[in-house]
Amino acid sequence: MFKKMSATTSKTDQKAALDIASWLFNVVTSVGIILVNKALMATYGFSFATTLTGLHFGTTTLLTTFLTWLGYIQPSQLPWPDLLKFVLFANFSIVGMNVSLMWNSVGFYQIAKLSMIPVSCLLEVMLDNVRYSRDTKLSILLVLAGVAVCTVTDVSVNLNGFLAAAIAVWSTALQQYYVHYLQRKYSLGSFNLLAHTAPVQAASLLLVGPFLDYWLTNQRVDAYNFSFVSLFFLILSCSIAVGTNLSQFICIGRFTAVSFQVLGHMKTILVLVLGFTFFGKEGLNLQVVLGMLIAILGMIWYGNASSKPGGKERRSLSIPITKSQKLSETNESDEKV
C-alpha cells in the first residue's frame, strides 16, 4: 500500500517537473524571439516578416531532418489533407503575428493575443461540444473587457494593425486546436508533428514571403543591406525559433490549447515589461495598464473557474476513439491540465 502511494507520488512529482520545464522552455524562447524580432524589424529595418518566418521554419527543417537521419525521430504518418489544413492555419497565424508585431506596439500586440483564450473556448464549444460554467463565461467576458480598454486607448493602434491582429488571433487559435487534435488522432509526438509540418511551411513561406513582404512594405528583401549586427540578430532569431516551435508543440501536447493560452499571462507580463523597457513607452498610459490588469485578472479567474467541478465539461468528442486509443487516452488523462 505504502509502496503504491509512493510510486503514485513519484509519478506526480515527475509530471509536475516536466510540466514546469516545458513551460519555462516555452516562456524563455517565446519572450526571447519577440524581443529579438522587434529589434530586427524596428531597429535594423528588416521588415520582411513573412520571409523571416520562412527562414525560421527552414532552420527547423534542417534540425528535424538531421534528427531523423540520426534516428531520434521515428517515421510516422500524417495524411496530406490534414497536413495542408494545418499548414494553412499555421501560416496565417505566423504571418499575422509577425505583421501585427511590425505594425503595432509591443503592448497592443501582446494584449491582442489575450483574446485567443475566448476564441479557443469558442472553438472547443463548436468543435468538441465543451460546456462552460457561469463563472468561466464571466471570466472570459472580463478578458474581453480588458482587451477592449487597451484597444480603445492604445495610441499605437491602426486599422491595418488591428486587422492583422484579428487574423492572427483566429488562425492561431485554429492552429493550436489542430496541434492537440492531430497529436491525439494520429498518436504523434512533438518532434514527429514538427518534422511533418516544418518543411511544407518553410517551402510555402519562402516562396510567397518575398512577394507578400514587397506588397506590405514596398521593399525588396534581396535589396536589404545587411550589417554584421543585423545578420547576427537574423541568425539569433532563426536559432530561437527552433526552440519556440518545438516548445509550443510540447506544451500543447502536454496541456490543451485553452490551458496553454491561460498560462500565457506570465509571458504577457514579461513581454510588456521588457518591451516598454527596451523599446520605449510607446502606447503606455494609465488606461492601457488598467486594461492589461483587467485582462490578466480575467485570465487568472478563468483558470480557477474552469478547474472547478462543472467549470468545463466535455459532452462529446469530435475525434473518433478506437479501441487501441482508449488505453492510451486513459494514460493521457493524467498528462492533461
Swiss-Prot record:
Molecular function in Gene Ontology: antiporter activity; nucleotide-sugar transmembrane transporter activity; transmembrane transporter activity; UDP-galactose transmembrane transporter activity
Region annotation (Disordered) ranges: 307-337
Tissue: Ubiquitous.
GO cellular component labels: Golgi apparatus; Golgi membrane
Record-linked InterPro entries: Sugar_P_trans_dom, TPT_transporter
Task of the protein: Nucleotide-sugar transporter that transports UDP-rhamnose or UDP-galactose and UMP in a strict counter-exchange mode.
Protein name per the record: UDP-rhamnose/UDP-galactose transporter 4
Natural source organism: Arabidopsis thaliana
